[in-house]
A protein has these predicted regions:
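Short glycine-rich phosphate-binding loop at a beta-alpha junction
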Residues: 6-8, 91-96, 181
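Conserved S/T- and glycine-rich ATP-binding loop of Class I adenylate-forming
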Residues: 11, 100, 182
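Gly/Ala-rich beta-loop-alpha elbow adjacent to hydrolase catalytic centers
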Residues: 77, 92-100, 104, 108
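A short acidic, glycine/proline-enriched capping/turn motif at secondary-structure boundaries
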Residues: 80, 101-102, 143-144
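Alpha/beta catalytic cores of group-transfer enzymes, especially the acyltransferase/condensing modules
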Residues: 108-257
Length: 266
């Protein structure tokens, strides 16, 4: 009897130095999949992900930027997904946070492999070229992963204080389990780093990240809609669940499908 499984797709920040060579170590036999993602890169004059993955040294200024990290993560995740034994596991739904939502669309079949590669590459490039601000992660749990109400209250008070400062812009970016991710402009990031309580790891600024999921990136929305065609989106064959529990279901027309995906991601 098959086990039922929910697949959670990774987002940005999941291809680090330890992952260099991941495709060759774990998925060398999936050359067709890698070639499909490479083709999306070659079409836009970018370095193929196979070349980035096979580099002799991990270079943060190359491997961590959105235009390169995004398609690298996409290729690794899609190869992992393809490796799941469907005779053992019945995948009942897929989900993902942030960039992981794009990957979830591809895993669900709403985007095919090439369409997903184009979407991820387009969005990674846009964020790299036109992104603004950044993100900071701070925990709202203790060492035993127990929610600390005083930490939640501290963040609320900090955000209220920030609203009264006209020279900074700070927003809640993601409520990520036991972490709060804050998005801000450069002045806001500096302000947060000076005020958030520190330990040996946090507050942590996410390098090469823009102020994702905040009004600071509203200017990218019309560009993204123009660069990503509705015709790439299909019916899919696995439910795609958003972080709010909304399920991406087949719609009657291409336009309705594309709008459903837009609304679900928002």
């Amino acid at each position: 009897m098959k086990k039922r499984a929910l697949v959670v797709c990774p987002g940005r920040g999941t291809y680090n130095a330890a992952e260099l060579g991941y495709l060759q170590r774990h998925h060398a036999a999936r050359s067709d999949l890698i070639a499909t993602v490479d083709a999306a890169r070659v079409a836009t004059g970018q370095v193929p992900i196979s070349q980035l993955d096979s580099a002799t040294k991990y270079t943060p200024s190359v491997h961590m930027t959105g235009d390169n990290a995004s398609p690298l993560i996409y290729a690794c995740a899609m190869a992992d997904f393809a490796a799941i034994d469907r005779d053992r596991f019945d995948i009942v739904a897929v989900t993902g946070n942030s960039m992981g939502w794009y990957l979830a669309l591809a895993c669900a079949g709403i985007l095919d492999l090439a369409g997903g590669a184009r979407l991820v590459n387009n969005m990674g490039g846009l964020m790299h070229q036109q992104g603004a601000g950044g993100q900071i992660v701070w925990p709202i749990v203790d060492d035993d992963w127990q929610i600390q109400e005083n930490n939640i209250l501290f963040v609320r008070n900090l955000l209220a204080e920030a609203k009264a400062v006209s020279t900074i812009k700070i927003y809640v970016s993601i409520r990520l389990g036991g972490m709060i991710v804050l998005a801000a402009d450069e002045a806001g990031l500096k302000w947060l780093m000076e005020r958030l309580p520190k330990d040996d790891r946090f507050p942590l600024r996410l390098m090469h990240h823009a102020a994702f999921h905040s009004p600071l990136l509203n200017h990218i929305v019309p560009i993204a809609r123009a660069e990503n065609q509705a015709s790439d989106f299909g019916r899919g064959d696995i439910p795609a669940m958003t972080g709010r529990g909304v399920s991406g279901r087949p719609a009657r027309s291409v336009a309705q499908r594309f709008m459903t995906i837009r609304l679900a991601r928002n």
